[in-house]
A protein has these predicted regions:
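Short acidic, Gly/Ser-rich segments with clustered Asp/Glu that frequently serve as metal-coordination loops
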Residues: 248, 332-333
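Non-catalytic interface/linker regions that flank or bridge core catalytic/transmembrane domains
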Residues: 1-203, 207-208, 384
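Acidic-histidine catalytic/liganding microenvironments
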Residues: 13, 112, 227, 286, ...
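Phosphate/pyrophosphate-binding active-site loops
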Residues: 267-268, 278-279, 333, 345-348
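Histidine/acidic-rich helix-loop-helix segments that form or flank divalent-metal centers
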Residues: 238-242, 270, 283-325, 340, ...
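Active-site-flanking alpha-helical
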Residues: 252-253, 306, 336
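Acidic/His-rich, divalent-metal-binding segments that scaffold phosphate/diphosphate chemistry
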Residues: 137-273, 280-285, 291-292
């Protein structure tokens, strides 16, 4: 029977839901076992019954990427080598590619040794993404899986996807995989009745990871959903732009990547404020990325009052989708850096007229709507 590697991921749910949910996920995983997507990943892999011995290995930390141990899911045959980290440069390979997946070995490290993360080679990230994206599609379409779990699956696949883009660039197969994730985002925001509850209580963010792009995607598409002109194509276009919006930072000096704009010198700030232009240049000429995505990337820091960058566009000269992302980008930074709940970060923005002036009023109004039902709305938007 296929084992499920994610008990820890559902521990925050009420106890009575744990076992039915685990069974539901196991059932979903069983339906994709032996399917085309999994078989393609297993092609050419030497498979073994049972589990190989654990092996201590050395390697550069930059060669590895991590995932929370409670959120690791595997096919019956392990698709790639899986490690735990002993210390910098030292790892133990606890699962070997081709082995039969062993949940007990995972549980030993999670429960007995309190290990929080599993690691795998960045060269195997594409395999992880392909399997995880296929599984996420099934999870999101299931009526039995709660929205919190759906969002967790989507977060993991989006975060690792952005890592892959930043590492490997905009290769055709990577862009196509991004389109699949955009479809998943649409399905989540379009079908879920409990989306407002999820957004109000969302606290699963890590300021040291690429979760930023996922959070921007989730909140941006939720705002777009409030507009009468919203459509699947619009939401998927915005999702792609959200995942790529900071791609221009790949061309910035590495020393600036961990520095906030407020702490930069005038010279470094000028370099930073050019990253939307660099991002647009990177996707320019790529026929797999439509022009709307390119325009959003170059405008995602433009403000409605003309105080943004790189071109200080103002008012109607800014694309609505770009101004939405500008708002959400600011909101996510406030939420994460100040460790605020989403609703508190919203209030922080609304209490500052200078901040509110950066965004089209209708965007701010629709931002409020994603947290509360219109008839319950009591927040007054400051006048611009």
């Amino acid at each position: 029977m296929l084992k499920v590697g994610g008990k820890g991921a559902i521990s925050s749910l009420k106890a009575k839901t744990v076992f039915p949910l685990a069974a539901t996920i196991e059932e979903i995983m069983r339906t994709i076992e032996g399917g085309k997507n999994v078989n393609e990943l297993l092609a050419g892999m030497k498979r073994r019954e049972g589990v190989s011995d654990e092996v201590e290995v050395s390697g550069e930390d930059t060669e590895f990427t991590k995932i929370k141990i409670g959120e690791f899911y595997s096919s019956k045959a392990v698709l790639f080598d899986v490690f735990i980290q002993l210390n910098s440069g030292k790892y133990i390979k606890i699962l070997h590619a081709g082995d039969t997946f062993d949940q007990q070995r995972i549980d030993k490290y999670k429960n007995d040794k309190k290990i929080e993360y599993l690691w795998f080679k960045k060269t195997d990230r594409a395999k992880y993404l392909k399997y995880q994206a296929h599984l996420t599609t099934k999870i999101i379409s299931s009526e039995k899986v709660p929205i919190e779990m759906k969002a967790r699956f989507l977060k993991n696949v989006t975060s690792k996807y952005v890592e892959e883009v930043m590492s490997e660039g905009l290769k055709p197969q990577i862009i196509e995989q991004g389109k699949q994730i955009c479809e998943q985002v649409f399905q989540l925001v379009d079908k879920e009745k409990n989306l407002a509850k999820l957004l109000r209580g969302y606290q699963e963010f890590d300021p040291t990871s690429v979760d930023h792009s996922y959070l921007v995607t989730l909140f941006t598409t939720s705002i777009i959903k409030q507009f009468e002109w919203q459509s699947q194509a619009t939401i998927e276009t915005a999702s792609m732009a959200c995942m790529f919006h900071d791609i221009g930072k790949m061309k910035m000096p590495e020393r600036l990547l961990e520095v906030r704009p407020g702490d930069m010198s005038a010279e470094d700030l000028e370099l930073y404020q050019n990253h939307p232009v660099l991002g647009a240049e990177m996707v320019d000429g790529n026929n797999l990325i439509n022009n709307s995505v390119k325009q959003i990337i170059i405008q995602h820091h433009e403000y409605f009052d003309g105080t943004g960058f790189p071109f200080k566009k103002k008012g109607a000269k800014i694309l609505t989708l770009a101004n939405i992302i500008a708002l959400v980008d600011d909101f996510v930074h406030i939420m994460v850096e100040r460790k605020m709940k989403p609703t508190d970060a919203l209030k922080f923005i609304l209490m500052d007229p200078l901040k509110v002036a950066r965004y089209n009023t209708i965007i701010v109004e629709n931002f409020i709507k994603i947290f509360v039902e219109p008839e319950k709305m009591k927040i007054i938007i400051p006048t611009q």
